[in-house]
């Protein structure tokens, strides 16, 4: 039986110990974690294979299985991400600002750890390492609750982390996992406000809503990516095709994949046949409005009429919505209606229209002439991310180290009293 109150107490105690560590001590523990991830590859992959087999037996989609899958290459990449976190500046103890008041009181606003982070996620074993490494770097303890699909993978990964912490002389309970698949434990975790300071869900809309609606702990909402690319009439069409191919097909199971392509009406008949030919080898399936449907059917593309609900879909597959718009105003209006405030891009040669798009589109990341696939902590130079926040309070976009800190005012006087 999982005792969450005991886990919370242990995490709170570990968080205090972590908050007192030097940057060197934390980095040493992270280095040991990276080493053990590589040294224990065979064991980790064997446990992950159990999860993959169960996923296939249970009929899970290929997009979910891709998220669940660990390979030697992916494990090496995860270990490298941990080492990259080591190389990042530690925000804890950083003086944000300050000054001296007329009373002589000296003020400094200093970054401090949040305390204990609760992370709830689905079929993403890499999140176990990503979140743990960022939390440890910032002096936070973490309680991890992965989906039942990752049960074996998470258990071995947390074991690797705890062994590294023990070797480094740090509290093992700084990183804990709820491995019991009982969903009632999620609700219990969401009410563990005596011990947990922040909840970060990573998963679909259902998980986000569950946490937002039921938690007594502050929740960071995000990760749902209904991302758009608008191809404006002045865009370099050949270079635009390369960006769209990257944004849709590089790894479609990620939240920064483009799901809807907006094409300006004046170039649609010229551009869409090129798009169909470009993406044919990738087996992309189009869902198009009436105008785009007619054009794509004319070149024998794999296309169906798009529905209202599909315009709100986070496909996470090789499906792509295509909508024709008259111009930038209609493109922005469409994004405002259907976007999830994650990542939005314009392809254009007009600096004026690029500036207008950036000013009018409300999203965590807005791109000009670039793929939406860059919305990622590693790509942004933040190290592995704990989440991509699509809300506006506390953190927005890829959440790196600073997003896992708060601050306190340090006030130093000379036996100073208020007048």
From Swiss-Prot:
It comes from the Bacteria. CDD domains: ALDH_F18-19_ProA-GPR. One of its GO terms (cellular component) is cytoplasm. SUPFAM superfamilies: ALDH-like. Pfam families: Aldedh (PF00171). PROSITE patterns: PROA (PS01223). Pathway: Amino-acid biosynthesis; L-proline biosynthesis; L-glutamate 5-semialdehyde from L-glutamate: step 2/2. It is found in: Cytoplasm. One of its GO terms (molecular function) is NADP binding. Keywords: Amino-acid biosynthesis, Cytoplasm, NADP, Oxidoreductase, Proline biosynthesis. One of its GO terms (biological process) is L-proline biosynthetic process. Its EC number is 1.2.1.41. Its main location: cytoplasm. It catalyses: L-glutamate 5-semialdehyde + phosphate + NADP(+) = L-glutamyl 5-phosphate + NADPH + H(+). PANTHER family: DELTA-1-PYRROLINE-5-CARBOXYLATE SYNTHASE, GLUTAMATE SEMIALDEHYDE DEHYDROGENASE. Catalyzes the NADPH-dependent reduction of L-glutamate 5-phosphate into L-glutamate 5-semialdehyde and phosphate. The product spontaneously undergoes cyclization to form 1-pyrroline-5-carboxylate. Belongs to the gamma-glutamyl phosphate reductase family. HAMAP family: ProA. This is Gamma-glutamyl phosphate reductase. It comes from Mannheimia succiniciproducens (strain KCTC 0769BP / MBEL55E). The lineage of its organism: Bacteria, Pseudomonadati, Pseudomonadota, Gammaproteobacteria, Pasteurellales.
